[in-house]
């Protein structure tokens, strides 16, 4: 039928409008307020955070490139562990927050969600631009 379709597997979105109960906004807000950052397990779960502006850019490219067709990973190069995210928040926000391990198990410890961007880059020219550090500082200024 000649209808081109594209689906996107979006990794962990960050930025304006994201669910405030997820780990990224929670850690940024707590670090900004000097509250303790609580980690489950070893804090070794790795996620790749992608800013909503990068998501919008990819969707725009998909719509207007005329080349998008298939399933794409929509992510960035911001793969960090939960512990690294906590440390970045404390450092960048010059916070007195402590990073505390709850003692509770995280069934996803050692899980790594870091996907290839090769397909989306080749097909529509998507390249993420916003670094995790920029996203943390931006969210802190909004919170």
Where are these regions (language model features)?
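Conserved beta-loop-beta element that borders a ligand/cofactor-binding pocket
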Residues: 1-16
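Short beta-loop-alpha junction of Rossmann-like oxidoreductase domains
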Residues: 16-23
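C-terminal substrate-binding subdomain of Rossmann-fold SDR/epimerase-dehydratase oxidoreductases
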Residues: 31-143
